[in-house]
Amino acid sequence: MMKKIFLVAGLLLAGAMTTNAKTAVDRMDPPMWWTGMENQQLQIMVTGEGIRDAVPSVDCPGVKLDSVARLDSPNYQFLYLTIGSDAKPGTVDITFASGKRKIKKQYELLARQGDGASHEGFDSSDVLYLMMPDRFADGGDVKHQSTNFDYRIDRTNPGARHGGTLKGISDHLDYLEELGVTAVWLTPVLENDMPGGCYHGYATTDYYRVDPRFGSNDDYRRLISECHSRGIKVVMDMIFNHCGLYHPWLYDLPSHDWLNAQPTADGIRSVQQANLTGKRNAAVDSLLLTNFRLNTVHDPYVSQYDFNHTVDGWFVSGMPDLNQRNPHLMTYLIQNSIWWIEYAGINGIRMDTYPYADMEAMARWNRAVAREYPRFNIVGESWLENEASIAYMQRGNKLNPVNTELPTVMDFPLCLMAQQAFGEQTKSGSDGLNRLFNHLALDMLYADCSRLLTFYDNHDTDRFLLEEPSDLARWKQAQAFLLTTRGIPQIYYGTEVLMHGSKAVTDGYVRLDMPGGFPGDSVSVFTADGRTPLQRDAFNFMSRLLHWRQGNKAVSAGTLRHFMPSNQLYVYERTNGDRRFIVLMNGTDEPLTDVDMSRYVEIMRPGDTFRDVITGDAVTVAPHMSFPARATLVLE
């Protein structure tokens, strides 16, 4: 358990204090690289006892050692190489000379499997399906006790690990294909070797290793390949703002400024002990924690005190805040993301806690990724509550003095208003479906509103459904809007089978297991027979829209024209070339009768005939029409 970790820590500290200790090379990150990259510069972070002061040399045609960075710890060395255009795939011989002793290592250079310019990202033609690997399905393939910290698989505890694996996801790709999603976003899969199991994945302890409780690096790459064979893209969840408290760095920090608000070594040990025992101590109380007030990042009147607390404060005591202003650390993180794109073939990155990291450093990262993969997409989690704040984070915003270079932002204002928008009666100009109209009217703030990730819920929010519904009218209305408005829709796993829950007690209640994904489950929603009649109705409704959406340019690239719901009916049109569709939604629990349709002559006239996308029925526009309570029509 902890013995192994503290033994390693002790050895590293002993190395720091012993001048005559033998020099060693234990690890090099990245573990390998590729020839033919657009950026020919490569940083190799070398870790090993006493390695800092060793003298390195490189022997490989086309590869040049440009410089060596030596920081505070004696156990790290940073090599900066140029991988020239004439470098060939193979091995790079690296020698570290320490006194009379020489350590020889071979570093592997691989040939790129494809052209970065053609590497496909996700966009508004896709629908992302967000799932938590620990909670989706157990493939029965992983030996679970494979970490330094003890933990339990306990499905009765919403805060414990439940045993989901990457193979469990692979086993149910037929289900995702049947549903009709075109991309999956997995919450973080990298190693989180932390007390309690850290099932959610947001406390990385190894940036180059898939958590063994999910599977291996090869398993991850295999899953992505299987997804691609079915036309499903994969988005990887990453965190640059912080790492896990028990990352090896925390036992021997490379430099005095590797972390923001960096405690002393003894202080870190005390914080680790407090997290292990669950008992606060003075070290925890003295930590600078974030104030979570993200409006400080764009506040023109912000005090330095408040700003520093936002971006330099630790997220929680178990997640040390990384200092992206340290150029060696930022290069490490940039290369890590490029490594996963090249190694695994991911199609996008969702960057957690985006505004908490240094804005200029993150812009450097976005530029670096776009240089290698121009069609790749990155979405930043910017949990801001109004449209202007969200727009500020997107690249090309004219009010932000820093061009963030961030292509896609998350439409949190839509998420935060969703339950009211579809739960209230649409009467005044500010309630019910008017909220959607007013929200879209602010799209002029965005540099590119087609690059908004639209969603109603995720693993950090209440589910859209707080309890099991008895009627699907409002739910269908909400899903129809999400899948037909501008942006890139994201649905949370289980939405299609009416999973519900609130995080009022604990986040675990909005992260429940997918029924049928685990041994012993009494029902399985992965098959139609395992779903209730209401679940079948919900699944079929969503599946029809998702399949209709695939390849539909009117949805992915169409212009949008909408009519304010002053008569309780919200109507909008999407058009691209000769393809278009119209959506009509009754925003009340009462039927609308004898609605004068003349106000919509810009998009439809009496006698025009459409096909109802859901039912397949023909619908002919009349001068006056009636709509049942909460009716939703998608007409093509």
Describe the role of every protein-language-model region:
Residues 131, 176, 186, 207, ...:
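Conserved, mostly hydrophobic/aromatic
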Residues 447-470:
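Active-site clefts of carbohydrate-active enzymes
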Residues 2, 6, 21, 101-103, ...:
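Carbohydrate-interacting/catalytic domains
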Residues 136-182, 186-338, 343, 362-371, ...:
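Substrate-binding/active-site clefts of carbohydrate-active enzymes
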Residues 1-26:
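Bacterial Sec-dependent N-terminal signal peptides
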Residues 224, 242, 251, 336-338, ...:
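Active-site-proximal helices and loops of the catalytic beta/alpha 8
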Residues 37-100:
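Immunoglobulin-like IPT/TIG beta-sandwich domains and homologous Ig-like subdomains
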